[in-house]
Amino acid sequence: VTGTAAMLISALFISSLRKYITEDTISNFMDNRYNKRVGYLYSYAYLLMGFIYIPIQLFTITTIFRTIMPNLSLTWACIIGLILAISYTVISGISGANYVSKISCILMYALMAVGLFIVLVKTSGIPNMKANLAPSYFTPFSMPTKTWFSWFLTTLVAFLTMQAAIQPSLIAKDDSNARRGIVFGALLNLPCGFICALLGMACMTMNLDVQGISSMAFATVINTYCPPLLTSAIFASIGLIVICTLAGQLLAIGTIFRQLLQPVYNKNNFSDKKTLTITRVITFVYGLLTIIPTFAVQQSALNQLVTVLVACVTGPMFFSLLAGMYWKQMNSTAASWSIISGIVTGVIWVVTGMSAAWHPVYIILPVSSVVGFIVCKLTSKNGIAEV
């Protein structure tokens, strides 16, 4: 629900984003609006985030692979997932990934609806859940407000500042098509949470063994109660969606690499074909290297890790991006300090363990915004040269 609400609100900004981000990367906008240093700050922060974010996405596809093939090691599952995603990226591009993702999403919902019906029938449905689970599972607002609101803020910020999230909108035919795509994606996103929640509750009700990893609940309950053919179809559709999502992330990474290396390409007079080939090879190597942190990520903490990671990288960019579009007085000095202060604050918040009590998005957004505003006012008033 929070994701859908955030996506719908982000659609309100799409015309401005397309108006000001005239090239294909946010880092280019930062470069043109401020200076190269600000553009590099965005690019390097995004590449660092991708190095951790891609393994998190890989866990979903590896869970599916290892459910179907129990003897498959985590390493090989990761390699297969990455090769499929990178190959898909090379073949289809972002337009193909978006189109196939939407078709697969509709197919997945249809299959999951059938799977949910079968699971509920075989587990005695909602009455059995109510008899075995705490009442809080059936109360919409049992989750603390600060938790779900942090998810909403993080998702909203991510949809406005993440290259992978905004790239499809930037290449859309016009503002209307871009906005329509966001609304369609938001509506497709909504049912998934409810279906997965019910399947997870069924898994808990029947005390199925998920090895202490909550992310295994979905695959376990589907594999236990659904017919093999339906199980395979559900896993295949989900796997394709995850691969499309991963492909979109790799496309964004590749776009940023190309932008960073463009001066080198121009200096050596590389052709477009050679430029594309080199960028793809670098992206492929980068993708393979992301297998390394995969083994350091705790599967039991995936949901929290995703929102914390995204908040710590995209949150510091939020003020600089929006102020750059709507506030003419905003300068590169203020943008640099806003981003740096946000990143440093996020790192300190996580390292000191304070993120366990309060999500870092609550401190990153106000700190980076206040620092950016104050520095902008000081530099403008005193005529301090921009960095």
Predicted regions and their residues:
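Membrane-embedded helix-loop-helix hairpins and adjacent transmembrane boundary segments
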Residues: 1-387
